[in-house]
C-alpha cells in the first residue's frame, strides 16, 4: 500500500513537471521567443556591423545588422536619406564616429527589442515606409512597414528595361519587400502596380503571417498552416512553390547553358575563399574543365561558383571572370550581357526565400520573362 502511494505521488509529480514544462514551452514570452529567432544573431552583427570587421564600411551594414546602427540610421531614413549611416552634417561616417555609436566588437548588439520598439513599445515605423534603400516606398502596409525598412534589396532602384545596368551588383539577402511589392526585376515592367495581396490586402502585411497567426510571434516564423488559414486546407506553401521552383530551376539551367557555351574563354578569375573570406587574384582556370555553375553573391556582387571536373568549386564575382590575367584580361561577361540581368532576377527569388508564396503572380511572370530574354 505504502509503495503504491509513493508510486502514485511520484507519477503525479512527474505529470506536474511535464505539464509545467509544456505550459512554459507553449507560453514563452516575447524575449524568450526572440532568443530563438534569427534576429538574435550576434555573430552576424560582429562580422557585418563592427568597425573592427568593416572599418568605415560598417556604416553600410550596421544599418540593418545591429540595434545601435538601426537606431542611429532610422532618423536619417525618415528624413529621406536611405544611404549608409552619415554624420549629422551629412558627411560620410568614419571609424571614430561609428565607434561612438558603439559599433564595436565589445558593444554592438543584434536586432533587439529596442531596435523595433520605441517608448511604450510603439513600433518605430508603421503603415508607410520612407524611401527604402531599394529605391521605392511601400504604402499602406501596416505594421509590416517596419520589417520592410531592412528586408529589401538595398541596392537602389533598377531600370527594368535597361540593356546595360553597368554593374554586377546583386540583390541583398532577405529581399522580401521587392518581391512582395513587385519591384526591382529586369525584363518585366515593374513601374505599375504588381504588389501582392499578401502585402497590400492583408492587414499589417508581413506581421500578419509571421507574427499574428503564429503561436510564437517574436520567433517571426510563419506557421506551417498559414496558407490554409485563408485559402483552405488543401493549400500549403508547397502547393504554390512547386511550379515556381520548376521555373527557378529552368532559369538556372538557362544561365548555366550560356556559361558552358563560352567556358573555353574563361582562363583567369579572382577567386574567393568562403572559408577564409579572402580573395586571390589571377587564379588560372582551365575553362574546358568547367562542368556547371551555381549562382550566389559575394560582397554584394553577383558570383558564379564554377564546378570543375575534379570536384573543386571556384567562387568568383562575375566581373572578375576573365579571358586573360591582369589588366589586359577582358571580362567574359560584360555588364550588357543579358546573363547579368538574368542572374540578378535569379538571386532576387533565391533571396526572397518564399519561392512564390509572397507574390506568386509577379514571381511567375518575372521568371518567364527572364527565360524569354535569354537567347
Would you name each region that the model predicts?
Residues 232, 238-240, 245-375:
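Mature extracytoplasmic or organellar-lumen-exposed domains after removal of signal/transit peptides
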Residues 210, 231-234:
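Active-site proximal loops enriched in glycine and acidic residues that flank catalytic Cys/His/Asp
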Residues 10-18:
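Bacterial N-terminal signal peptides
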Residues 19-145, 149-220, 349:
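Sequence context of c-type cytochrome heme-c attachment sites
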Residues 1-7:
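Positively charged n-region of N-terminal signal peptides that target proteins for export
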Residues 76-89, 222-223, 237-254:
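Gly/Gly-Pro-rich "capping" loops immediately C-terminal to redox-active cysteine motifs
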Residues 31, 236-237:
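Internal amphipathic alpha-helical segments of the cytochrome P450 catalytic fold
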Residues 227-228:
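Cysteine-rich micro-motifs
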Amino acid at each position: 500500500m505504502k509503495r503504491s502511494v509513493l508510486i502514485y505521488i511520484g507519477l503525479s509529480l512527474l505529470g506536474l513537471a511535464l505539464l509545467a514544462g509544456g505550459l512554459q514551452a507553449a507560453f514563452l514570452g516575447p524575449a524568450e521567443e526572440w532568443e530563438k529567432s534569427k534576429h538574435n544573431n550576434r555573430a552576424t552583427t560582429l562580422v557585418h556591423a563592427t568597425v573592427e570587421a568593416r572599418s568605415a564600411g560598417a556604416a553600410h551594414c550596421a544599418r540593418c545588422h545591429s540595434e545601435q546602427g538601426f537606431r542611429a540610421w532610422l532618423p536619417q531614413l525618415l528624413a529621406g536619406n536611405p544611404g549608409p549611416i552619415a554624420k549629422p552634417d551629412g558627411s560620410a561616417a568614419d571609424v571614430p564616429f561609428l565607434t561612438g555609436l558603439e559599433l564595436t566588437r565589445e558593444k554592438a548588439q543584434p536586432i533587439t527589442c529596442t531596435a523595433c520598439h520605441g517608448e511604450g513599445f510603439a513600433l518605430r515605423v508603421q503603415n508607410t515606409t520612407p524611401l527604402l534603400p531599394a529605391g521605392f516606398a511601400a504604402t499602406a502596409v501596416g505594421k509590416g512597414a517596419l520589417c520592410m525598412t531592412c528586408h529589401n534589396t538595398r541596392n537602389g532602384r533598377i531600370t527594368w528595361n535597361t540593356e546595360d545596368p553597368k554593374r554586377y551588383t546583386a540583390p541583398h539577402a532577405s529581399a522580401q519587400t521587392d518581391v512582395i511589392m513587385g519591384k526591382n526585376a529586369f525584363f518585366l515592367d515593374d513601374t505599375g502596380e504588381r504588389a501582392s495581396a499578401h502585402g497590400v490586402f492583408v492587414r499589417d502585411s508581413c506581421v500578419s503571417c509571421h507574427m499574428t497567426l503564429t503561436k510564437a510571434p517574436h520567433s517571426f516564423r510563419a506557421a506551417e498552416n498559414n496558407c490554409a488559414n485563408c485559402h483552405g486546407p488543401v493549400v500549403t506553401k508547397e502547393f504554390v512553390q512547386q511550379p515556381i521552383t520548376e521555373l527557378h530551376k529552368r532559369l538556372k539551367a538557362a544561365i548555366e547553358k550560356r556559361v558552358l557555351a563560352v567556358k573555353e574563354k574563361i582562363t583567369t578569375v579572382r577567386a574567393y575563399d568562403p572559408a577564409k573570406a579572402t580573395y586571390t587574384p589571377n587564379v588560372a582556370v582551365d575553362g574546358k574543365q568547367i562542368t556547371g555553375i551555381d549562382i550566389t553573391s559575394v560582397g554584394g556582387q553577383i558570383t558564379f561558383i564554377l564546378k570543375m571536373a575534379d570536384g573543386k568549386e571556384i567562387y568568383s564575382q562575375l566581373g572578375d571572370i576573365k579571358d586573360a590575367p591582369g589588366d589586359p584580361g577582358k571580362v567574359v561577361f560584360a555588364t550588357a550581357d543579358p546573363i547579368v540581368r538574368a542572374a540578378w532576377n535569379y538571386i532576387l527569388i533565391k533571396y526572397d526565400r518564399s519561392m512564390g508564396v509572397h507574390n506568386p503572380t509577379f514571381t511567375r511572370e518575372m521568371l518567364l520573362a527572364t527565360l524569354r530574354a535569354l537567347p
